[in-house]
Design a protein with these regions (language model features):
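N-terminal leader/linker segments that precede catalytic domains of diphosphate-processing enzymes
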Residues: 1-250
Length: 250
């Protein structure tokens, strides 16, 4: 069995609840913040979902969520690397615009603040408040959101006939992009009970959604071959074709 077959077979094994009315996937984004400053293996920021959630209660996840319409109108300190932008726009559903591509990164850093209390951006005491209530915290912290540190590491679309469907871009950045944190180390949304920096092996021993486990494997494999996360490196794109997942490289 090839590496690609092993990764897709795990996802296929859990996709049995497909009896719901088909819905259009919502755009979503998530962020893997990677830390290699402490020595030893790379660690990734993970959060434990609150037990009150109906969707994966108690599971460990990366910060992230749906893209909001206002995410495409946020004032940014800088832009993606051109090759990252090109990958984000590959086979984009609906209007294929740079503003929509930027919204993925903005959603990822917004959700990271809301859930984990971490600001990704450029410290600027005179930062202009960005659009949207969620970015008031950035303005108060004197941080302007930025996209330059982000690398696309995967994309996945939930199969048809699932109760919830997302077209998710998985972005990554190094912990050196962190410009600040909330005092209590948690975000204002209350969606996560706890956050922790885990090695990939530690993370895979927690309760994880299948796609999260798969992305951990994908990123671990990439780091072994591409430790600098070169923006030109092809990234996996998972989507449902016929009776199972297809994994292609973008």
């Amino acid at each position: 069995m090839t590496e690609a077959e092993a990764l897709t077979s795990r996802l296929n094994a859990v996709e049995r609840d497909r009896k719901h009315k088909n819905i259009r996937p919502s755009d979503a984004a998530t962020l893997l913040i990677l830390d290699r400053t402490a020595g030893g293996p790379v660690r990734v920021l993970m959060g434990k979902r609150h037990m009150r959630h109906r969707f994966f209660p108690g599971a460990f996840v990366f910060p992230g969520g749906k893209v909001d319409p206002a995410d495409s109108r946020v004032r940014l300190a800088d832009d993606y690397h051109p090759q990252v932008l090109a990958k984000l726009m590959h086979e984009m559903r609906g209007p294929k615009t740079v503003a929509r591509a930027r919204a993925f990164g903005v959603a990822a850093l917004r959700e990271t603040y809301e859930e984990a209390g971490i600001f990704i951006g450029v410290p600027r005491g005179d930062a202009v408040p960005a659009a949207g209530v969620s970015f008031a915290g950035f303005a108060e912290a004197g941080v302007q959101p930025q996209l330059a540190p982000f690398r696309l590491v995967a994309r996945a679309i939930t199969p048809p006939n699932r109760p919830r469907r997302f077209d998710t871009r998985f972005l990554a950045c190094w912990a050196t992009a962190i410009a600040g944190r909330t005092p209590d180390g948690l975000g204002p949304s209350g969606e996560l009970e706890d956050v922790a920096w885990l090695t990939f092996e530690e993370a895979k021993k927690t309760e994880l959604p299948a796609i999260t486990f798969t992305i951990l494997d994908e990123v671990a494999n990439r780091l072994s071959r591409d430790p600098a996360l070169d923006p030109a490196t092809p990234v996996p794109f998972y989507r449902w074709r016929g009776k199972g997942f297809e994994r292609m490289l973008v």
